[in-house]
Amino acid sequence: MITWHDGDLRPLDVARLGDRYRRYRFTDPDAETAMAGSLRRYGQLSPLVVCLRDETHEVLDGFKRLAAARILGLNTLSCEPTMHR
């Protein structure tokens, strides 16, 4: 059982972050590439917002940051869990 508290920041493994809610967003490959440049240059400035669904951390906010991290081959990203349903 994973203990979560709203507002906690946790580093989570990029490979284990789910993106099933991404289908509700428009994607822009150029914006993802630009985000990768920003992430490389400045680091991660704000956490992804995630929720736990079926024992998977699903991204709710931060899809460009997740795509950029995958482009760069990063292992972890700072994430803020939320319990809102």
Predicted regions and their residues:
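Basic, flexible Lys/Arg- and Gly-enriched helix-loop patches that mediate nucleic-acid binding at interfaces
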Residues: 85
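Short, charged/polar connector segments at secondary-structure boundaries
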Residues: 1-82
